[in-house]
């Protein structure tokens, strides 16, 4: 077998195995009712960085290996879509409600060839994201900010700002002296 064909075969095999691992993660592992097992799998096989006392509930859906970091005492509730191809960084004491969608990839609509692109999403400490909110690629949610349920965040949010709507716009402010500790884990989620 020529060297080029062998390298091509190895690259294809690696891609197929990577896709199989993601399929197994999203269709089997994320249905296991044990935080310990899921978190261990994510750390070892997906190479995620997961802080202590953080929880990722069942049916969280990931799009890639690596590119995912969550700090201490943070929670991602059930059925969240986490497109980590461009990188997702989540701080400490962050609460992400059910069915939130965080996207890090899109297409350049001004490009004649519909170029795909990735941009990271950064969620700083003490952020709250309400149910079914959508966070788009390239957004930073500043420390202590809050996103209302159903909001679509298209631009970065300053610290301690509350946003709501489609597209999300500022509607208020949170206190700047936040000091709570999130320790939320349900037994079978």
Task: Annotate each language-model stretch with its function.
Residues 131-155:
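Beta-rich strand-turn-strand
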């Amino acid at each position: 077998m020529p060297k080029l064909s062998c390298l091509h075969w190895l690259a294809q095999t690696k891609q197929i195995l990577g896709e199989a691992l993601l399929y197994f993660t999203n269709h089997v592992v994320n249905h296991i009712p044990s935080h310990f097992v899921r978190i261990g799998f994510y750390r070892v096989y997906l190479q995620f960085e997961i802080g202590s006392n953080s929880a990722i509930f069942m049916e969280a859906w990931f799009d890639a290996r690596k590119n995912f970091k969550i700090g201490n005492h943070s929670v991602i509730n059930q059925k969240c879509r986490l497109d980590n191809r461009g990188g997702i960084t989540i701080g400490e004491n962050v609460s992400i409600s059910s069915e939130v969608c965080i996207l890090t990839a899109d297409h350049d609509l001004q490009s004649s060839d519909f170029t795909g692109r990735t941009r990271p999403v950064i969620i700083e400490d003490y952020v709250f994201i309400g149910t079914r909110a959508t966070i788009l690629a390239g957004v930073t949610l500043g420390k202590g900010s809050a996103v209302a349920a159903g909001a679509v965040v298209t631009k970065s949010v300053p610290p301690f700002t509350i946003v709501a709507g489609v597209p999300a716009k500022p509607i208020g402010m949170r206190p700047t002296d936040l000091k709570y500790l999130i320790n939320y884990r349900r037994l079978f989620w």
